[in-house]
Amino acid sequence: MKDFSDFFRNPHIWDREIVAVGGDLSPERLLYAYKNGIFPWSDQPILWYCLDPRSIFDLNKLHISKRLKRKINQKRYTITFNRAFEQVMRCCAYRPGEDTWITDLFIKSYTEFHKLGYAHSLEVWDENGKLGGGVYGIAIGNFFAGESMFSFIPDFGKIGLFHLFETLKKDHFTLFDTQQLNLVTLSLGAYQIPKKEYLKRLESAVASGKKWNPSHFVL
């Protein structure tokens, strides 16, 4: 892995959230960043963050309502992995009347990261084959960073997240990073931990460096 330690501040000792400004979104830089607890927001210029506190999910404690559980069990949908990565990103970026950090530069760069086996998507299709929801994120070793999700059909994003959790548990993932807490992730059970604890858990989770191949799961 290429060394970018001269570009990024060391998040173990740097006490500010922004650890670098500028650079590019090359696969090598993204891989180094995520393995060290750093992620990019915005692209004019690119700002690189390591937040304190950090928001994570416990993979065994996703909050699912009884109504949503019934909808999940009805199985009026199909789940796929990595079938429409760029489309999922564009759907996540589609927010009429709102700004989005998922710009064309991010879509192009993360699609390249996807082709290298580090970025992944989960798609939720309705009974007519329409893409109704999805999630995408980064997987390294036993670490997953959830980047964004969308629902064009009510609850399909949450259904996708449920199946993502189940799949990650089967593949022995140990850390699910949600970066920053918001109302949606909070309602689903996300919580915050100190950066120091997060970085310690991250180091263990990414240690193997293995790429994830979820295609063997049939949902």
From Swiss-Prot:
It is found in: Cytoplasm. InterPro entries: Acyl_CoA_acyltransferase, Leu/Phe-tRNA_Trfase, Leu/Phe-tRNA_Trfase_C, Leu/Phe-tRNA_Trfase_N. It comes from the Bacteria. Pfam families: Leu_Phe_trans (PF03588). Its main location: cytoplasm. Its EC number is 2.3.2.6. GO terms for cellular component: cytoplasm. Keywords: Acyltransferase, Cytoplasm, Transferase. One of its GO terms (biological process) is protein catabolic process. It catalyses: N-terminal L-lysyl-[protein] + L-leucyl-tRNA(Leu) = N-terminal L-leucyl-L-lysyl-[protein] + tRNA(Leu) + H(+); N-terminal L-arginyl-[protein] + L-leucyl-tRNA(Leu) = N-terminal L-leucyl-L-arginyl-[protein] + tRNA(Leu) + H(+); L-phenylalanyl-tRNA(Phe) + an N-terminal L-alpha-aminoacyl-[protein] = an N-terminal L-phenylalanyl-L-alpha-aminoacyl-[protein] + tRNA(Phe). The keyword Acyltransferase applies. The keyword Endoplasmic reticulum does not apply. GO terms for molecular function: leucyl-tRNA--protein transferase activity. SUPFAM superfamilies: Acyl-CoA N-acyltransferases (Nat) (SSF55729). HAMAP family: Leu_Phe_trans (MF_00688). Functions in the N-end rule pathway of protein degradation where it conjugates Leu, Phe and, less efficiently, Met from aminoacyl-tRNAs to the N-termini of proteins containing an N-terminal arginine or lysine. NCBIfam families: aat. PANTHER family: LEUCYL/PHENYLALANYL-TRNA--PROTEIN TRANSFERASE, LEUCYL_PHENYLALANYL-TRNA--PROTEIN TRANSFERASE. Belongs to the L/F-transferase family. This is Leucyl/phenylalanyl-tRNA--protein transferase. The gene is aat.
